[in-house]
């Protein structure tokens, strides 16, 4: 095999080339891996792709804005439709006519309002009599509960304070309940102790009488342990 000409740049190999040949010969890397690494796109291609993505996102945002405008136009199309505008104009015209009639009869209406309405029967059709009765029942119920409603409205700003007071009262009630339970247990124990003492006294008197008859000094009276602990506690 002829030696490579060191003066020929085409036949000379660099250190990187020699290293890659050594890696391929040793099996650490393959030619396919080297080919894939050669085909990687340069960084400028990624910049161009990023610019394309930004342009596409801007276009999507613009399309979304146009879509929202179309939806808004569709929703408001019924309001500005000629038929709806005609109805509104008719309502305004009828209101205007009513106001003109009120202004024409202003003096008569004022005199009627100044005149008292006591002891006068208002004309009411028979069809609406039952509704009037029901309305009167509702009015009576409302008047009866009116003061309660007023108190509720007045106390509504102080609702938090009332809740705190209620919580404190409940806590105190729990403490009192616990103390009452302890007191009840102590009373039951005291009753049991009194029962034991009442049963023991006749027996003690009998023994004392018997010892007295035999001229023997009686021992000190025996009290149960529970009675001694209760006396010390007192």
Swiss-Prot record:
Highest rank taxon of the organism: Eukaryota
A single cellular component GO annotation: spindle microtubule
Main location: cytoplasm
Record key words, sorted: Cell cycle, Cell division, Coiled coil, Cytoplasm, Cytoskeleton, Microtubule, Mitosis
InterPro entries referenced in this protein's UniProt entry, alphabetically: HAUS2, HAUS2_metazoa
Secretion signal span: none
UniProt entry tagged with the keyword Cell division: yes
Chain coiled-coil ranges: 85-105, 162-182
Biological role: Contributes to mitotic spindle assembly, maintenance of centrosome integrity and completion of cytokinesis as part of the HAUS augmin-like complex.
PANTHER family membership: HAUS AUGMIN-LIKE COMPLEX SUBUNIT 2
Record family assignment: Belongs to the HAUS2 family.
Subunit structure: Component of the HAUS augmin-like complex. The complex interacts with the gamma-tubulin ring complex and this interaction is required for spindle assembly. Interacts with EML3 (phosphorylated at 'Thr-882').
Protein name per UniProt: HAUS augmin-like complex subunit 2
Annotated organism of origin: Mus musculus (Mouse)
């Amino acid at each position: 095999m002829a030696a490579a000409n060191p003066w020929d740049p085409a036949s000379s190999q660099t250190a990187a080339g020699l290293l890659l040949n050594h890696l391929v010969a040793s099996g650490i890397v393959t030619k396919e891996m080297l080919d894939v690494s050669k085909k990687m796109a340069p960084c400028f291609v990624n910049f161009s792709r990023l610019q394309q993505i930004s342009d596409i996102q801007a276009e999507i945002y613009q399309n979304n804005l146009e879509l929202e405008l179309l939806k808004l136009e569709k929703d408001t199309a019924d309001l500005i439709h000629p038929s709806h505008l005609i109805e509104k104009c008719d309502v305004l015209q009828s209101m205007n006519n009513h106001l003109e009639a009120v202004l024409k009869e202003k003096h008569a209406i004022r005199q009627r309002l100044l005149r008292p309405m006591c002891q006068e029967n208002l004309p009411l059709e028979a069809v609406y009599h039952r509704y009037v009765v029901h309305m009167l029942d509702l009015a009576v119920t409302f008047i009866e509960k009116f003061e309660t409603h007023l108190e509720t409205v007045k106390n509504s700003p102080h609702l938090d304070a009332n809740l705190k007071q209620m919580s404190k009262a409940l806590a105190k009630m729990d403490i009192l309940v616990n103390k009452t339970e302890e007191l009840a247990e102590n009373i039951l124990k005291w009753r049991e102790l009194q029962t034991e003492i009442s049963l023991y006294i006749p027996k003690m008197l009998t023994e004392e009488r018997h010892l007295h008859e035999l001229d023997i000094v009686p021992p000190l009276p025996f009290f149960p342990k529970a009675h001694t602990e209760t006396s010390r506690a007192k």
